[in-house]
Protein backbone atom coordinates (compact mmCIF):
# COMPACT_ATOMS: atom_id res chain seq x y z
CA UNK A 1 0.00 0.00 0.00
CA UNK A 2 0.87 3.66 -0.27
CA UNK A 3 2.45 5.61 2.58
CA UNK A 4 0.10 7.39 4.97
CA UNK A 5 1.08 10.96 3.99
CA UNK A 6 0.34 10.22 0.32
CA UNK A 7 -2.97 8.58 1.24
CA UNK A 8 -3.98 11.64 3.25
CA UNK A 9 -3.17 13.96 0.34
CA UNK A 10 -5.38 11.81 -1.93
CA UNK A 11 -8.11 11.96 0.71
CA UNK A 12 -7.95 15.76 0.82
CA UNK A 13 -8.25 15.98 -2.98
CA UNK A 14 -11.18 13.55 -3.09
CA UNK A 15 -12.98 15.44 -0.32
CA UNK A 16 -12.42 18.77 -2.09
CA UNK A 17 -13.99 17.32 -5.25
CA UNK A 18 -17.00 16.00 -3.30
CA UNK A 19 -17.52 19.35 -1.54
CA UNK A 20 -17.14 21.33 -4.77
CA UNK A 21 -20.10 19.46 -6.22
CA UNK A 22 -22.16 20.45 -3.16
CA UNK A 23 -21.35 24.15 -3.39
CA UNK A 24 -20.86 25.01 -7.08
CA UNK A 25 -24.04 25.26 -9.13
CA UNK A 26 -24.25 22.90 -12.13
CA UNK A 27 -21.05 21.09 -11.15
CA UNK A 28 -21.36 17.34 -10.86
CA UNK A 29 -18.82 14.74 -9.77
CA UNK A 30 -18.93 11.10 -10.77
CA UNK A 31 -17.00 8.37 -8.96
CA UNK A 32 -13.99 6.78 -10.61
CA UNK A 33 -12.45 5.22 -7.50
CA UNK A 34 -13.41 1.71 -8.61
CA UNK A 35 -11.96 2.04 -12.11
CA UNK A 36 -8.65 0.70 -13.42
CA UNK A 37 -5.69 2.96 -14.17
CA UNK A 38 -2.86 2.54 -16.65
CA UNK A 39 -0.43 4.16 -14.19
CA UNK A 40 -0.71 5.99 -10.88
CA UNK A 41 -3.28 8.58 -12.04
CA UNK A 42 -4.55 7.95 -15.60
CA UNK A 43 -7.72 5.95 -16.29
CA UNK A 44 -7.45 2.99 -18.63
CA UNK A 45 -9.33 3.16 -21.94
CA UNK A 46 -11.96 0.70 -20.64
CA UNK A 47 -12.43 2.83 -17.54
CA UNK A 48 -12.97 5.90 -19.71
CA UNK A 49 -15.91 4.15 -21.40
CA UNK A 50 -17.51 3.43 -18.01
CA UNK A 51 -16.77 6.97 -16.83
CA UNK A 52 -18.40 8.41 -19.96
CA UNK A 53 -21.52 6.33 -19.35
CA UNK A 54 -21.70 7.52 -15.74
CA UNK A 55 -21.19 11.13 -16.80
CA UNK A 56 -23.97 10.89 -19.38
CA UNK A 57 -26.42 9.40 -16.86
CA UNK A 58 -25.60 12.01 -14.23
CA UNK A 59 -25.84 14.86 -16.76
CA UNK A 60 -29.29 13.66 -17.85
CA UNK A 61 -30.59 13.90 -14.31
CA UNK A 62 -28.62 16.74 -12.75
CA UNK A 63 -28.26 19.12 -15.70
CA UNK A 64 -31.26 18.32 -17.91
CA UNK A 65 -33.83 17.13 -15.35
CA UNK A 66 -34.48 13.89 -17.18
CA UNK A 67 -34.42 10.29 -16.01
CA UNK A 68 -30.85 9.38 -15.10
CA UNK A 69 -28.57 8.74 -12.14
CA UNK A 70 -26.77 10.78 -9.52
CA UNK A 71 -23.59 10.02 -7.64
CA UNK A 72 -24.21 8.58 -4.15
CA UNK A 73 -22.97 11.38 -1.92
CA UNK A 74 -22.78 11.10 1.84
CA UNK A 75 -25.13 13.59 3.54
CA UNK A 76 -24.37 12.93 7.19
CA UNK A 77 -22.54 10.53 9.48
CA UNK A 78 -24.31 9.88 12.79
CA UNK A 79 -22.97 7.91 15.75
CA UNK A 80 -25.25 5.00 16.69
CA UNK A 81 -23.32 3.50 19.59
CA UNK A 82 -19.79 3.01 20.83
CA UNK A 83 -18.69 1.33 17.56
CA UNK A 84 -21.42 2.06 15.01
CA UNK A 85 -22.28 4.78 12.53
CA UNK A 86 -25.26 5.50 10.32
CA UNK A 87 -24.14 6.74 6.90
CA UNK A 88 -26.98 8.80 5.41
CA UNK A 89 -27.22 9.30 1.64
CA UNK A 90 -29.44 11.50 -0.48
CA UNK A 91 -32.85 10.51 -1.80
CA UNK A 92 -32.92 7.87 -4.50
CA UNK A 93 -29.84 6.02 -3.27
CA UNK A 94 -30.69 2.52 -2.09
CA UNK A 95 -27.18 1.63 -0.93
CA UNK A 96 -25.53 -1.78 -0.92
CA UNK A 97 -22.38 -2.37 1.16
CA UNK A 98 -19.21 -4.06 0.01
CA UNK A 99 -19.12 -7.73 1.05
CA UNK A 100 -17.60 -8.44 4.48
CA UNK A 101 -15.37 -5.97 6.31
CA UNK A 102 -15.04 -2.74 4.33
CA UNK A 103 -11.32 -1.97 4.14
CA UNK A 104 -12.07 1.41 2.55
CA UNK A 105 -13.96 2.89 5.52
CA UNK A 106 -12.33 4.29 8.65
CA UNK A 107 -13.14 6.34 11.72
CA UNK A 108 -10.35 8.52 13.05
CA UNK A 109 -10.37 9.69 16.65
CA UNK A 110 -7.64 10.94 19.01
CA UNK A 111 -6.24 7.39 19.23
CA UNK A 112 -5.89 6.98 15.45
CA UNK A 113 -7.53 5.15 12.55
CA UNK A 114 -10.12 2.44 13.17
CA UNK A 115 -10.97 -0.14 10.50
CA UNK A 116 -14.56 -0.97 9.53
CA UNK A 117 -15.34 -4.54 10.61
CA UNK A 118 -18.82 -4.77 9.06
CA UNK A 119 -21.10 -2.69 6.88
CA UNK A 120 -24.78 -3.46 6.36
CA UNK A 121 -27.78 -2.10 4.49
CA UNK A 122 -30.34 -0.08 6.42
CA UNK A 123 -33.12 2.16 5.08
CA UNK A 124 -31.72 5.52 3.96
CA UNK A 125 -28.10 4.45 3.97
CA UNK A 126 -25.64 2.07 5.54
CA UNK A 127 -24.73 1.02 9.07
CA UNK A 128 -21.00 0.62 9.63
CA UNK A 129 -19.39 -1.07 12.63
CA UNK A 130 -15.77 -0.53 13.62
CA UNK A 131 -13.12 -2.67 15.31
CA UNK A 132 -13.04 -0.67 18.56
CA UNK A 133 -15.02 1.93 20.46
CA UNK A 134 -14.34 5.52 19.43
CA UNK A 135 -14.71 8.84 21.17
CA UNK A 136 -15.97 12.10 19.73
CA UNK A 137 -14.76 14.30 18.22
CA UNK A 138 -14.01 11.89 15.41
CA UNK A 139 -14.00 11.94 11.62
CA UNK A 140 -15.16 9.46 8.97
CA UNK A 141 -13.21 8.57 5.82
CA UNK A 142 -14.37 6.34 2.92
CA UNK A 143 -12.36 5.18 -0.12
CA UNK A 144 -9.86 7.95 0.52
CA UNK A 145 -6.56 6.15 0.03
CA UNK A 146 -4.43 6.32 -3.10
CA UNK A 147 -5.10 2.61 -3.69
CA UNK A 148 -8.71 1.95 -2.62
CA UNK A 149 -10.06 -1.58 -2.05
CA UNK A 150 -11.50 -3.60 -4.92
CA UNK A 151 -15.03 -3.65 -3.50
CA UNK A 152 -16.89 -0.43 -2.65
CA UNK A 153 -20.36 0.43 -1.36
CA UNK A 154 -22.69 1.16 -4.30
CA UNK A 155 -26.26 2.19 -4.87
CA UNK A 156 -28.66 -0.27 -6.43
CA UNK A 157 -27.85 1.04 -9.93
CA UNK A 158 -24.20 0.05 -9.41
CA UNK A 159 -22.86 3.59 -8.96
CA UNK A 160 -20.14 3.64 -6.24
CA UNK A 161 -20.42 6.16 -3.44
CA UNK A 162 -18.23 9.23 -3.73
CA UNK A 163 -15.04 9.13 -1.67
CA UNK A 164 -14.94 11.29 1.43
CA UNK A 165 -12.32 12.32 3.97
CA UNK A 166 -12.62 13.98 7.35
CA UNK A 167 -16.42 14.09 7.55
CA UNK A 168 -17.48 15.12 11.04
CA UNK A 169 -19.33 12.45 12.99
CA UNK A 170 -22.50 13.82 14.61
CA UNK A 171 -23.84 12.69 17.99
Set out the residue ranges of the language-model regions.
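Cell-envelope and extracellular/periplasmic
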Residues: 1-171
Amino acid sequence: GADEARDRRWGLVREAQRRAAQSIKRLVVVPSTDLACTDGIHNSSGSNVILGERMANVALKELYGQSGLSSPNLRRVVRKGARKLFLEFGEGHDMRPAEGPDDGMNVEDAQGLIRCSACNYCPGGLEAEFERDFELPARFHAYWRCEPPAFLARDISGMPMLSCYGVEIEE
